[in-house]
Amino acid sequence: MGEPAFTSFPSLPVLGKLKRNMMPWALQKKREIHMAKAHRRRAARSALPMRLTSCIFRRPVTRIRSHPDNQVRRRKGDEHLEKPQQLCAYRRLQALQPCSSQGEGSSPLHLESVLSILAPGTAGESLDRAGAERVRSPLEPTPGRFPAVAGGPTPGMGCQLPPPLSGQLVTPADIRRQARRVKKARERLAKALQADRLARRAEM
């Protein structure tokens, strides 16, 4: 009889090389999703977001750092907003809507109707019209005025409709002229404040 054939047994796993994930599958999946979102957020934060509320020109928002000289304080989620909504101001405007005496909300007046009611005429125009009305007969209607009410004053006396606002166009020259006026006014104010400060210091 020959020698028995050598049968090879599979080697037992070495404990040092045995690696097993002890994390449950659901928790592992949640961790992978969280890491993917964090990676996308880091990629999106490579460029500074743009602020659209403080100025008409776009400029980058200051990042939040642990530094005392930071000027902008905001939450983490606000840096990804394209155009933040002014909810507080909108609610204040809603609270200021006109209401009737019964408490019911009424529609706001248009700008043209308000101007047609409240726009006063100039003093020179009212004097010229007063002199011209003495020559006219009392039954002749005056253009641009309301008809007189029997037993009461004329509601349109001294009121004239203003020119339409659509005809008044603002040009770049007007903007530059206004900017120069503002700059000169600020310079005059700074000089006056400096002179007042020096005078108070001299009195002390």
UniProtKB/Swiss-Prot annotation:
Region of interest: Disordered: 126-145
Stretches assigned to coiled coil: none
Comp. bias (Basic and acidic residues): 126-137
Family annotation (InterPro entries): MBD2/MBD3_p55-bd (IPR032343), MeCpG-bd_2/3_C_dom (IPR025884)
GO function terms (MF aspect): methyl-CpG binding
Gene Ontology annotations for the cellular component aspect, listed alphabetically: nucleus
Note in the entry: The MBD3L proteins are encoded by strongly repeated regions of the 19p13 chromosome. The exact number of functional copies is unclear, and some of them may represent pseudogenes.
Protein family: Belongs to the MBD3L family.
Protein name: Methyl-CpG-binding domain protein 3-like 2B
